C-alpha cells in the first residue's frame, strides 16, 4: 500500500512505534493469558503445558524481542517494519502533510474522538506548534445568556483569531495567553516562537470566523457508545456534565454550521 509518505515520516513512525508504552507489560501479559485460555479450551491446537512453560521462561528472561528463526530468514529473507495501530487511522493526514507542506491545519470534532491524541502524535512526528482551543474559554464578562445560547459561541474565537491566527498568518511569534478555569482569568503571556507548521486543535476551531486561516482541516468523529465509554474512563465525575451540557453544545455547533462537511477529511476513531 503506497501512502506517499516521506521517508523521514516513515522513519519517525517506526521509531515512535518501538517506544515502550506505559502499560506495555500489563497489556502483553493480558494477551498471554488470553492465549493460554484459548489453548486450555482446545480452541488452539497447542500443548497447554509446553506453551505455559515456554511463556514462563520468556517472562523470566524479561520478554526479549522475538526474532525469526535462521531457517525462516534463509528461506524468505523477511524485510519489513511495524507501526503502532494508533497511527493507522491518520495515514491519509500524514500523506497530505508530507505532500503539501501546510502552514496551518485545524483539528475539530466530537469530544473524546481523539483530537488531543492526534495533535500529540503530529507533534511527535513533525516540528510544529500546537495551539488548543481549550485555552480560550470565555471570560466571565463574555458569558451572557444570549451568547451561551448561540451555537459555536461558547469559546473566545475573537481572542483566538487576534492573538494566535493573525500573528501566525504573518509568520510572527505568538504571545500565548491561556485562560485559567481555576482563577477564571487570563494568565501571563508565553512567547511561542514561530514555526512554519502549526496545528489548531479543539472543538470550535472551525468556527466560521477562523476557517479562512487554515490550509487543511480534519474532523474526528466517534460513535456514541464509544464516546461515552471514553469519557467515563477519562473523568467519571464529569460524565453527566458532558452528556447534559458539553455534548449538546458541540452537536448544535456541528449541525448548525455543517462543520463535518466543511472539513477536508473526516476520520472515525471509534475502533482506534
Task: Please provide the spans of the model-predicted regions.
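Pre-Walker A (Motif I) flank of P-loop NTPase domains
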Residues: 101-105, 195
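N-terminal pre-Walker A segment at the start of P-loop NTPase domains
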Residues: 75-100
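Conserved nucleotide-sensing/catalytic segment adjacent to the nucleotide-binding pocket
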Residues: 129-132, 138-191, 197-198
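Long, basic/Gly/Ser/Thr-rich N-terminal segments
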Residues: 1-71
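P-loop (Walker A) phosphate-binding loop of NTP-binding proteins
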Residues: 110
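ATP-dependent NMP and nucleoside kinases share a basic, alpha-helical "lid"
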Residues: 186-234
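Conserved lysine of the Walker
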Residues: 115
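Post-Walker A alpha-helix
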Residues: 118-119
Amino acid at each position: 500500500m503506497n501512502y506517499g509518505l516521506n521517508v523521514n515520516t516513515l522513519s519517525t513512525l517506526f521509531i515512535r512505534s518501538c517506544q515502550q508504552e506505559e502499560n506495555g507489560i500489563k497489556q502483553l501479559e493480558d494477551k498471554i493469558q488470553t492465549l493460554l485460555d484459548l489453548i486450555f479450551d482446545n480452541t488452539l491446537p497447542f500443548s497447554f503445558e509446553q506453551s505455559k512453560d515456554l511463556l514462563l521462561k520468556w517472562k523470566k528472561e524479561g520478554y526479549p524481542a522475538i526474532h525469526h528463526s535462521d531457517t525462516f530468514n534463509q528461506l524468505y529473507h523477511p524485510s519489513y517494519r511495524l507501526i503502532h495501530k494508533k497511527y493507522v487511522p491518520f495515514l491519509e493526514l500524514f500523506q497530505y502533510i508530507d505532500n503539501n507542506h501546510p502552514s496551518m491545519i485545524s483539528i475539530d470534532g466530537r469530544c473524546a474522538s481523539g483530537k488531543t491524541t492526534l495533535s500529540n502524535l503530529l507533534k511527535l512526528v513533525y516540528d510544529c506548534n500546537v495551539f488548543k482551543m481549550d485555552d480560550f474559554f470565555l471570560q466571565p464578562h463574555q458569558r451572557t445568556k444570549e451568547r451561551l445560547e448561540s451555537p459555536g459561541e461558547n469559546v473566545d474565537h475573537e481572542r483566538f483569531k487576534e492573538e494566535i491566527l493573525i500573528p501566525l498568518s504573518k509568520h510572527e511569534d505568538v504571545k500565548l495567553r491561556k485562560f485559567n478555569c481555576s482563577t477564571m482569568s487570563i494568565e501571563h503571556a508565553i512567547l511561542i516562537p514561530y514555526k512554519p507548521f502549526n496545528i489548531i486543535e479543539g472543538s470550535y476551531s472551525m468556527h466560521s470566523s477562523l476557517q479562512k486561516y487554515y490550509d487543511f482541516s480534519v474532523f474526528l468523529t466517534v460513535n456514541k457508545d464509544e464516546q461515552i465509554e471514553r469519557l467515563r474512563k477519562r473523568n467519571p465525575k464529569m460524565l453527566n456534565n458532558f452528556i447534559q451540557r458539553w455534548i449538546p453544545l458541540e452537536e448544535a455547533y456541528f449541525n448548525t454550521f455543517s462543520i463535518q462537511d466543511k472539513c477536508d477529511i473526516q476520520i472515525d476513531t471509534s475502533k482506534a
